């Protein structure tokens, strides 16, 4: 066991507009070089586009997108007697949220729309409707876990 002190989790404050902690975390993932105000403009702009196009509450669409992208199981490498097995394990709630946010932002960055807010809005709308690159990533992860179900007894 390590003797080092485990780093304390910093408190994340709710965002000023919607009062949502998940949205703040999302902004932190969008942020580059510590430019929080730019990240806020991008995220709020994307949510406005979502509201305009879908005529739905944007924060609801955002949460639907996160729920649809969050993986239930993933595979982790486990070495047993010279062989490395991909062992399927359940994803903890905290990691589930982090992966969903990471995959959603990554998919948005890889899109072809002109501005980041347009890309983010499009990916959020796709994810809330169970389409898009981020949802495909989750499906691939689940498929990997399903394919390696035989090794689930190596779980730790």
Swiss-Prot record:
Among the record's GO biological process terms, what is one?
A: translation
Identify the keywords attached in UniProt to this record, alphabetized.
Ribonucleoprotein, Ribosomal protein, RNA-binding, rRNA-binding, tRNA-binding
Q: What's an example of a GO molecular-function annotation for this chain? A: tRNA binding
Pfam families noted in UniProt: Ribosomal_S7
- A GO CC term assigned to this protein in UniProt: small ribosomal subunit
Record-linked InterPro entries: Ribosomal_uS7, Ribosomal_uS7_bac/org-type, Ribosomal_uS7_CS, Ribosomal_uS7_dom, Ribosomal_uS7_dom_sf
Look up the domain of life of the source: Bacteria
The cross-references to NCBIfam families, in alphabetical order and at most eight, read:
rpsG_bact
Alphabetical list of HAMAP family matching this protein: Ribosomal_uS7_B
Q: What does this protein do?
A: One of the primary rRNA binding proteins, it binds directly to 16S rRNA where it nucleates assembly of the head domain of the 30S subunit. Is located at the subunit interface close to the decoding center, probably blocks exit of the E-site tRNA.
- What do we know about how this protein assembles, alone or with others? Part of the 30S ribosomal subunit. Contacts proteins S9 and S11.
Which family, according to UniProt? Answer: Belongs to the universal ribosomal protein uS7 family.
Q: What is this protein called?
A: Small ribosomal subunit protein uS7
Gene coding for it = rpsG
